[in-house]
Amino acid sequence: MDSVAFEDVAVNFTQEEWALLDPSQKNLYREVMQETLRNLTSIGKKWNNQYIEDEHQNPRRNLRRLIGERLSESKESHQHGEVLTQVPDDTLKKKTPGVQSYESSVCGEIGIGLSSLNRHLRAFSYSSSLAIHGRTHTGEKPYECKECGKAFRFPSSVRRHERIHSAKKPYECKQCGKAFSFPSSVRRHERIHSAKKPYECKQCGKALSYLVSFQTHMRMHTGERPHKCNICGKAFFSPSSLKRHEKSHTGEKRYKCKQCDKAFNCPSSFQYHERTHSGEKPYECTQCRKAFRSVKYLRVHERKHTGEKPYECKLCGKGFISSTSFRYHEKTHTGEKPYECKKCVKAFSFVKDLRIHERTHTGEKPFECKQCGKTFTSSNSFHYHERTHTGEKPYECKQCGKAFRSASVLQKHIRTHTGEKPYGCKQCGKVFRVASQLKMHERTHTGEKPYECKQCGKAFISSNSIRYHKRTHTGEKPYKCKQCGKAFISSNSFLYHERIHTGEKPYECKQCGKAFRSASILQKHVRTHAG
């Protein structure tokens, strides 16, 4: 039997052409080529391995190796297969006598953006291949996952998807032992160990492992967001972000946790959630050994060591280590708050903040401390609380060496050195170091007291005030002095008390140099100078 060279049935792209394809076009290409090779095998054809094994920078050649691996995963046989040809029809007929060539009438006149992709995705050697190809236009997905009902165009796609449910991870990293569902995933992971990052940004010097990551990164500098939601018009840096967002409109949540029944719309969120049950933190910082549940949070953490702030505000020039903090900041300029609570009409800049706020109405506190059983409405509050048990204070002030449990508390502290008070009251002009202080102050003008005690009906201007007040009913005093054993209702009272033992007086009068244990006592003292 004659040997069939890989190139006889392959679509060829240059590196430049491949880089221009969007992910959906690349995925279509992969699926079709996998099916093609299976079909050739089933009818007894052989192909030349030299192309599949060839390691080269060209992504297409690396893809050949991937196809070879995927082919070995499946024993499924097919009677006929799709052959995408790069030669004219008459040449094809000479190579494969008696085989008719079919052309798609649906896509024959539709341009996909690249002439080579246009040319190759239209011609087929078998009628069954044309039928398979037709699904890309009709949207037909006949292969369905038995676990979650998600549908796919190809049987190979549903088999790969089913591994998410089965937790089957046959591909293991030789360096760290981490297991993966697919060979492509383990190869991506191995780059973490090899530190091979061939794509370097000329603007900030950051190096990236993948061309797609590099292109997405460049959009942070240019501000370009080419992927737009057809429903609400919101734009995104990458197609994967757009896909995740689109599911927020459909309400589709295919990935369900077996432990708590919580559902998710994407597998990465589902895997991250599973680790909250298992406690697994597979991503470790090489500098401080701190571990994280996702590689995304590790990358953000690493920037604290390097000082890198790749997200820069075009309005004020301020830099940020994460896209989340950058987006939060952007909305301080616009004042945009599109997410509104249906119960109290309070509005938020981000849907995540709305979800956390809604828990104040429902009473839901999904984050529980394993040491003391205390529960929290948000993961941030929970992580901050955990550090009260461990004593961990990872955020250190470079000026005085004082350490803090959270980055936000450190930022507030830094302003005691700089004197910066960026939050000003529009009614009286009084300025504050933190936004929460301004909000509480504004309520002294409006008379608003949104936090009411259910036991006695007393109302308060802040959540902290009502929390401390509730402890007068319960008798709870969670802050205990290690030196004398005295306990306190609030952290402020506790800190003030600690200074009696240490002698610390951090609040100093600028006029006479006298120092005090608390800001309130300093303010009283300052008035004695004013007369």
UniProtKB/Swiss-Prot annotation:
Organism classification: Eukaryota, Metazoa, Chordata, Craniata, Vertebrata
Record's keyword terms, sorted: Metal-binding, Nucleus, Repeat, Transcription, Transcription regulation, Zinc, Zinc-finger
Similarity annotation: Belongs to the krueppel C2H2-type zinc-finger protein family.
Annotated compartments: Nucleus
Residues covered by the KRAB domain: 4-90
Protein source organism: Homo sapiens
CDD domains reported in the protein's UniProt record: KRAB_A-box
GO cellular component: nucleus
Protein's recorded name: Zinc finger protein 878
Keyword Ligase belongs to the record: no
Described purpose of this protein according to its UniProt entry: May be involved in transcriptional regulation.
A GO molecular function held by the record: RNA polymerase II transcription regulatory region sequence-specific DNA binding
Renumbered zinc finger spans (C2H2-type): 122-137, 143-165, 171-193, 199-221, 227-249, 255-277, 283-305, 311-333, 339-361, 367-389, 395-417, 423-445, 451-473, 479-501, 507-529
Pfam families linked: KRAB, zf-C2H2
PANTHER family documented for this protein: ZINC FINGER PROTEIN (PTHR24381), ZINC FINGER PROTEIN 555 (PTHR24381:SF446)
InterPro entries for the chain: KRAB, KRAB_dom_sf, Znf_C2H2_sf, Znf_C2H2_type
Gene: ZNF878
